[in-house]
């Protein structure tokens, strides 16, 4: 009996260990591109604050342009393109987490009106599929299908991102109406300056934490510096740690002031946000407009014909 219980316990432990190892494998093997949008998704219920500011700006501090292009109007239950452009100088390199230089990535968040959502694959035309390429979009929340995120993806290939959007049909969704709706977009290029926990990344300027004289600068084996400053007020020593990446601007023996930049600003990226408007057009209204225009054209034609007929009658009476 004890042997059977021991065997059962060993079997359970092996099963549990395999499950844990499998979970670790899945987590560690997950593409890094899936991790970045989670920073905002985990910290904010809605990516757009009440002030209109998109929360990505809390980590990407530099202000850069972004542009969105959508049709002026769309019909219900149709697929259309929302094109987001994130321009930047393709020649520049950014500081990576290990201090080395690398290419910039881009990412975007698109906030659609309620009812609008990502178009399903079977509704996409070959032209749209070609524009999308290998991009993988995801909803900000399972319950918020109208908010889409993408990135980071290589900026050189995807500085222009095409979102395939499916418009809602008021006939099947009672909370959707034929109106003009706003859309909001945020786009970033490059790494952020602040991590979600509030700590700084190495994509920042490092400032002096004391006024005094630089006593010693030690270059670390894995990159970065350790700067010893002799405080001018009490002679104590203050050590500032510089992460790998930024270029050092000070030297030993140099007098510095509190908050003086010790390094250059390595950031070459930034975040921008914009908006656009789109009209969900009623097909009956379009048909009515076409009929109205057709009736006007027909009336004009009849008027011209009537005028010519009247002129012929007048001419015949004069000849008589």
Curated annotation (Swiss-Prot):
Binds 1 heme group covalently. Heme binds at residues 36, 56, 59-60. It comes from the Eukaryota. It is a single-pass membrane protein. The chain crosses the membrane at residues 286-305. Residues 1-35 form the signal peptide. One of its GO terms (biological process) is photosynthesis. Its main location: plastid. Its cofactor is heme. Pfam families: Apocytochr_F_C, Apocytochr_F_N. GO terms for molecular function: electron transfer activity; heme binding; iron ion binding. PROSITE patterns: CYTF. It is found in: Plastid, Chloroplast thylakoid membrane. One of its GO terms (cellular component) is chloroplast thylakoid membrane. Keywords: Chloroplast, Electron transport, Heme, Iron, Membrane, Metal-binding, Photosynthesis, Plastid, Signal, Thylakoid, Transmembrane, Transmembrane helix, Transport. The 4 large subunits of the cytochrome b6-f complex are cytochrome b6, subunit IV (17 kDa polypeptide, petD), cytochrome f and the Rieske protein, while the 4 small subunits are PetG, PetL, PetM and PetN. The complex functions as a dimer. Belongs to the cytochrome f family. Component of the cytochrome b6-f complex, which mediates electron transfer between photosystem II (PSII) and photosystem I (PSI), cyclic electron flow around PSI, and state transitions. This is Cytochrome f. It comes from Pisum sativum. The gene is petA.
């Amino acid at each position: 009996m004890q042997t059977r219980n021991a065997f059962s316990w060993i079997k359970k432990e092996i099963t549990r260990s395999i499950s844990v190892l499998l979970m670790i494998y899945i987590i560690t093997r997950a593409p890094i591109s899936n991790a970045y949008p989670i920073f905002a998704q985990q910290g904010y219920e809605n990516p757009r604050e009440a002030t209109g500011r998109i929360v990505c700006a809390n980590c990407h501090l530099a202000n850069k342009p972004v542009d969105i292009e959508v049709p002026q109007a769309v019909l219900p239950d149709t697929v259309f393109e929302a094109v987001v452009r994130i321009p930047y100088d393709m020649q520049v390199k950014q500081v990576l987490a290990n201090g080395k230089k690398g290419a910039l990535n881009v990412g975007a968040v698109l906030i659609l009106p309620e009812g609008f959502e990502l178009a399903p694959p079977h509704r996409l035309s070959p032209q749209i599929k070609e524009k999308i390429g290998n991009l993988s979009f995801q909803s900000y929340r399972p319950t918020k299908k109208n908010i889409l995120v993408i990135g980071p993806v290589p900026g050189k290939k995807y500085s222009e991102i095409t979102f395939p959007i499916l418009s809602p049909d008021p006939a099947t969704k009672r909370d959707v109406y034929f109106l003009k709706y706003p859309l909001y977009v945020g786009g970033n290029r490059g790494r952020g300056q602040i991590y979600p926990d509030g700590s700084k990344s190495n994509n920042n300027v490092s400032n002096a934490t004391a006024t005094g004289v630089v006593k010693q600068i030690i270059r670390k084996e894995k990159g970065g510096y350790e700067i010893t400053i002799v405080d001018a007020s009490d002679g104590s020593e203050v050590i500032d740690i510089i992460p790998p990446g930024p270029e050092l601007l000070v030297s030993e023996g140099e007098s510095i002031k509190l908050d003086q930049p010790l390094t250059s600003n390595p950031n070459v990226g930034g975040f921008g946000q914009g908006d656009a408007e789109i009209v969900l057009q009623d097909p009956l209204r379009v048909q009515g407009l076409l009929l109205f225009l057709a009736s006007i054209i027909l009336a004009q034609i009849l008027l011209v014909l009537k005028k010519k007929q009247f002129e012929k009658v007048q001419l015949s009476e004069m000849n008589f």
